């Protein structure tokens, strides 16, 4: 986020003498390359679901929602790089009205990426829970109509929240709201996991008769969640430290890894499609048919 970058640069100037940790600077080409790969991979996921009717189910629609979130995160960085390039070439007036508006739009995309990922993973967790413990009623509970309504509400909420957070991005309550959604999502999914574990112990025989794909879907969610936490948690921690201890030498030392934390976010968009392909034979076959022009 541009607001965070600007605040970080200001913090760096005021706290430079309090820390011996130099800033870790990564070439912009690395960010650009990872972002382009992330967009292309997730675009293939979306096209695979759109073109294959056997993949047009609630579970894959939720995966598409996560793929869109990943694409927004990658697109954010590409647009930011283009904006910086135009500004350095003199085509944009520094801190002019156009650049400020473009910054706000790009920041909104970044927030949409995080919020979209959080809620997409949450509905995938709920979907897996229903699949395992209400297998017989699954198709009557999780219908396509309810899936579309749920995703529409999620993205409307994320869009409204993203716009609000950009407008009030310099207020501490906004930062707290932004960062609190991350642990709240983890708590929600953790509660589902604990409940699933307790029910699994009491219904072990019943669960053993479920199709293997049901349990495989739960494992896929676990992997996706683990990658999401690994890639996003360092950035969320950076925002908290920048807000509450900007001049502490230990906090400043951690914040010197800002660009590394940003690269991890970009990597999340690249890793997720590989998880889909590795864990889902149907999606993997769809990828092969698309890449080899239906000759596979």
Swiss-Prot record:
Residues 50-58, 127-147, 200-217, 279-296 are cytoplasmic. Residues 1-23, 80-104, 169-180, 245-256 are extracellular. Belongs to the G-protein coupled receptor 1 family. Keywords: Cell membrane, Disulfide bond, G-protein coupled receptor, Glycoprotein, Lipoprotein, Membrane, Palmitate, Receptor, Transducer, Transmembrane, Transmembrane helix, Ubl conjugation. Pfam families: 7tm_1. GO terms for molecular function: corticotropin receptor activity. One of its GO terms (cellular component) is plasma membrane. It is a multi-pass membrane protein. Disulfide bonds join 21-253, 245-251. Ubiquitinated by MGRN1 that may be involved in post-endocytic trafficking and/or degradation of internalized receptor. PANTHER family: G-PROTEIN COUPLED RECEPTOR (PTHR22750). InterPro entries: ACTH_rcpt (IPR001168), GPCR_Rhodpsn (IPR000276), GPCR_Rhodpsn_7TM (IPR017452), Melcrt_ACTH_rcpt (IPR001671). Hormone receptor primarily expressed in adrenal cortex that plays a key role in regulating adrenocortical function. Upon corticotropin (ACTH) binding, facilitates the release of adrenal glucocorticoids, including cortisol and corticosterone. In addition, MC2R is required for fetal and neonatal adrenal gland development. Mechanistically, activates adenylate cyclase (cAMP), the MAPK cascade as well as the cAMP-dependent protein kinase A pathway leading to steroidogenic factor 1/NR5A1-mediated transcriptional activation. Homodimer. Interacts with corticotropin (ACTH). Interacts with MRAP; this interaction targets MC2R to the plasma membrane. Interacts with MRAP2; competing with MRAP for binding to MC2R and impairing the binding of corticotropin (ACTH). The chain crosses the membrane at residues 24-49, 59-79, 105-126, 148-168, 181-199, 218-244, 257-278. The keyword Transferase does not apply. This is Adrenocorticotropic hormone receptor. A lipid is attached at residue 293 (S-palmitoyl cysteine). GO terms for biological process: adenylate cyclase-activating G protein-coupled receptor signaling pathway; placenta development. Disruption phenotype: Most of the MC2R knockout mice die shortly after birth. Adrenal glands are considerably reduced in size compared with those of their WT siblings and they produce aldosterone at reduced levels. It is found in: Cell membrane. Glycans are attached at residues 12, 17. PROSITE patterns: G_PROTEIN_RECEP_F1_1, G_PROTEIN_RECEP_F1_2.
